[in-house]
């Protein structure tokens, strides 16, 4: 049977009911896209009534309800398994869609001659620009981040370059990678890349996916014409737990790609529309 769904939106939640209320309202009521879509909600063992809220208010949503905890990447993979859309929109529940957020991602991707991962422009709640684009990690970046205490506002040039603080925020451009809060990818490419690597429980899985996209002859693009508010979901994990997960994922990343990783970014044959 022919598939008529343009976009499968996948969102993963764990006790994020308050975020889901705004997320779903912006998607279904305030700014519903003109393209056809489905929403897949993957619930990671919530106990705050998230599932009941979705079932009661948005019965059209597909729900994957975990009986045990899974990591961010694996949860998105579980959602992708039942997705039927031409494109997958990996979207955190702490997002708020604006007018044409999804329409523009779809239209832009349709114009490209090759499959890419597209990252929209993320905004803070006050509509100011939120830095979500990154450079690939290196031992020097890791050391600089460690020595500066993870401060995003440090004047350290290595950190500033890693955080792409000098990016032209209104220019469509190739990037190394973008945070996994909002990524748009053709389902065929996601399948080709085998989705997110489940070896990462949390952190680094988005960078890993983007690196593999580059190395498979595809690309990652920042597309600022699509804008989405990102309310910065704050995990309840203690600092020690978060640091442990960061270090563990970093170890997996370097073990997989090497300490001095290489990418095929510069060899991409893809031309961006208007460039």
What are these regions (language model features)?
Residues 26, 43-51, 68:
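A conserved acidic beta->alpha catalytic loop
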Residues 137-175:
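Short, flexible, basic/aromatic active-site loop/helix in glycosyltransferases
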Residues 88:
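Short aromatic/hydrophobic "clamp" motif used to bind/position activated sugar donors
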């Amino acid at each position: 049977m022919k598939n008529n769904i343009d976009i499968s939106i996948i969102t993963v939640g764990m006790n994020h009911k308050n975020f889901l209320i705004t997320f779903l309202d912006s998607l279904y009521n305030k700014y519903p896209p003109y393209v056809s879509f489905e929403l897949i909600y993957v619930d990671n063992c919530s106990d705050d009534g998230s599932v009941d809220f979705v079932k009661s208010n948005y019965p059209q949503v597909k729900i994957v309800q975990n009986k045990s905890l899974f990591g961010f990447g694996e949860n998105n993979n579980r959602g992708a398994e039942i997705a039927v859309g031409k494109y997958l929109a990996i979207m955190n529940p702490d997002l708020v869609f604006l007018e044409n957020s999804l329409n523009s991602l779809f239209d832009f991707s349709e114009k490209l001659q090759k499959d890419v991962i597209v990252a929209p422009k993320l905004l803070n709640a006050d509509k100011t620009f939120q830095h979500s684009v990154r450079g690939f990690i290196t031992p020097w970046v890791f050391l600089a981040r460690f020595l500066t205490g993870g401060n995003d506002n440090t004047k350290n040039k290595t950190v500033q370059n890693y955080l792409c603080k000098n990016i032209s925020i209104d220019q469509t451009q190739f990037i190394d990678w973008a945070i996994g809060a909002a990524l748009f990818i053709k389902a065929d490419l996601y399948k080709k890349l085998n989705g997110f690597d489940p070896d990462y429980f949390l952190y680094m899985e988005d960078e890993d996916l983007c690196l593999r996209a580059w190395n498979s002859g595809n690309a990652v693009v920042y597309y600022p014409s699509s804008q989405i508010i990102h309310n910065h979901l704050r995990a309840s994990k203690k600092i020690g737990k978060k640091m442990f997960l960061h270090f563990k994922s970093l170890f997996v990343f370097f073990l997989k790609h090497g300490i001095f990783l290489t990418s095929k970014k510069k060899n991409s044959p893809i031309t961006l529309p208007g460039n």
